[in-house]
Amino acid sequence: MRTESFGELSGQDWEDVCNKLFHARYKDNYQEVPARYGGDYGVEGFTFDGQLFQCYSPKDEEFSSKTLYELQRDKITKDINKLIKNILEIRKLNKNQNIQNWHFVTPAFDNKDLHEHCRKKEEEIQTAIGQFINNDFKIMLQTENSYITEIGYLVNSKILQIQSTNKSYTEDELQLISQSDNEIVNKIRTKLQKLDSLKENENTLNKYTYLVFRFFIEGQEELEMLNKSYPDIFQGLSRLKNSIEKKVELKSMRGIDLKDLEKIQEEYKSDLEKGFKDICEISLLENLAQEAIADWMARCPIDFD
């Protein structure tokens, strides 16, 4: 399932990320339950003061709201049943501490009915094993937004890398977007058609135009994610881009061609890797380098006069 902070993650990847987040928040008080037991008990881990945790990321990338709700609802039902069945074994793990809350941690949810389902399951738990849980026991729905501080800490500590959003647009989607961003497309096309290698070949010119436009649109998705989830890192990337932009503008004044453009992109990517390779995965940095070229071409810094 797609996450805002780490792009597309498998169920196992999400579990690994969650365990790091739990360790960051609860320190040594958080204990992982080995998978061969956790799968049977309906918990990923626990704390000694009575918090239980379960992580869940559905396999597919795109869901309707109804489908996502049904998957998450059924997972909660299944694991709460395991919790009820194995409560005595779970109590052995956390020194017979009564259970305070059960945390269901998923990348996102978008249906209020999931809250209602949790309230029903809380009543079932109180009826079935009320002597082993607190009177105010709750099923807590949590997403990555519940752990923003921990995500920032782990990224800055270089324990986790920021992943690409992996957002990719089809040709039809690009055509549709270009209708609202027509000025950008026209600027890119106007500059590219000054090149001898492109101006005589309309088909190739169109392909290059939409390739650069793709770099721009998909790169903007990456920047939006960074600005929202990692504002400090976004500011650092922006400062680097602005400093390189001045050099690019000077090179453009002396005249550049497609080979020069490729060299500028590689040099910028190298600068990105020097400063951010420990905290950003390489595909994200590649997308940012491509976005910069497209952005500079859509504005003023790069021209082929």
Residue ranges and their predicted role:
Residues 1-98:
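Short, surface-exposed loop/strand segments
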Residues 1-12, 167-178, 262-272, 276-277:
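Interdomain/boundary linker segments immediately adjacent to catalytic/signaling cores
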Residues 4, 9, 29-35, 139, ...:
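Generic preference for hydrophobic/aromatic residues in regular secondary structure cores
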Residues 68-253:
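Acidic metal-coordinating catalytic centers involved in nucleic-acid phosphodiester chemistry
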Residues 225-305:
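Extended, amphipathic alpha-helical scaffolds
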